């Protein structure tokens, strides 16, 4: 089976047909910009080039994009890789379409190493379409970073549109946090994931031609075997504003619960829109709650609106921390992470930090050791008379917990040894108890529809 090396001449004539009209930001063809000397002869193709047949997008760009290393697969090859898209290899389904696990062997193509892959098939009746497929190919062909998922190749055959990615064995952050039988993520792992995702966003925002991700959420953060985070699903990504422009005007797309309020209201998209979404995910990591959960009381359904007022008060913060952590986290680290989430969720976009600043704040948090926080020894009260506990019951138990921690200081060595053992079992603690759990690009995929209390929807946000 022959696999062709990627060239833009092979994809443009067949796969640029049916491109939608440019959105509001593409009012006029931009002037050709001089290439940045730092980038040498490389200049990333902007998505706006898709809208103009006379532009350089119709030329052979294989020279300037020679380092992309994408492969063009045939549909028959992908059928072999996935065993005819067998239900046994089905990983799940998102807005783009179904995802199947496959395996590329050494005989498929010299130079293409044997490896497991995830094959995503565009559902022609799904939420996304050809433009989103092409957007993902164009962006991931040109962007490379340790915290972006790797696109290995694609298939564009008749009406079929498929993408072939590296396989991410730990699945998505959404599944790790919210799947019914998932093992709780330790505090240190949560901060590692947050930092990795932040680095991915910072890379996009600070590129020569900035990219706005536009759909940052827990289900789009995939995890490798070491829980290193990688951003996936670039179908809604947009080129950032250039020159003296402050924003990109576009249709409001994304996922409820994650989208920035000013973007929903105006359609004005900036890098700060991604920062807000990052703040929501950071809140999910802190609290173990979904960004939008209709199973909760009306006041608590929107996580950002409910939790943000409590992020700057230590005592209130302790009450909203994920109970699955069982009090095993760094108090100082939690306060700093909560303060960062508070800034990211500011309703004034200009007051949010840049993602590069977010990275600088998160990096030191990985060095904080997990300790047993007072709320860990909280015991659920039982009232034989059916009455309610006194209002200060929680505060009293927190004081008792702190007193108990002081008594444990003499046994500090044993607790420190326990923490080391706890970390050494990190890999074991994260093995799913059910092989049916999953996330996009992984055997651990669980579709949004099957996750309990799921209410996030990818859609036009009216």
Curated annotation (Swiss-Prot):
Annotated residues for binding of ATP: 91-99, 120
Residues modified as Phosphotyrosine: 165, 167
Keyword Kinase part of the UniProt annotation: yes
Compartments where located: Cell membrane
InterPro entries: Kinase-like_dom_sf, Plant_Ser_Thr_Prot_Kinase, Prot_kinase_dom, Ser-Thr/Tyr_kinase_cat_dom, Ser/Thr_kinase_AS
Segments passing through the bilayer: none
Keywords: ATP-binding, Cell membrane, Hypersensitive response elicitation, Kinase, Membrane, Nucleotide-binding, Phosphoprotein, Plant defense, Serine/threonine-protein kinase, Transferase
Keyword Phosphoprotein on entry: yes
Annotated consequence of substituting residue 167 to F: Reduced phosphorylation associated with lower induction of pathogenesis-related genes (e.g. PR5 and PR16) in response to pathogen-associated molecular patterns (PAMPs)
Function: Required for pathogen-associated molecular pattern (PAMP, e.g. chitin and flg22)-triggered immunity (PTI) involving reactive oxygen species (ROS) accumulation and triggering plant defense, including defense-related gene expression (e.g. PR1 and LOX). Ensures specific recognition of the EPD1 effector of Verticillium dahliae, resulting in a hypersensitive response known as effector-triggered immunity (ETI), characterized by the activation of programmed cell death to limit infection by the pathogen.
PANTHER family, per the entry: OS01G0588500 PROTEIN-RELATED
Protein name per the record: EPD1-interacting receptor-like cytoplasmic serine/threonine-protein kinase 5A
Protein species of origin: Gossypium barbadense (Sea Island cotton)
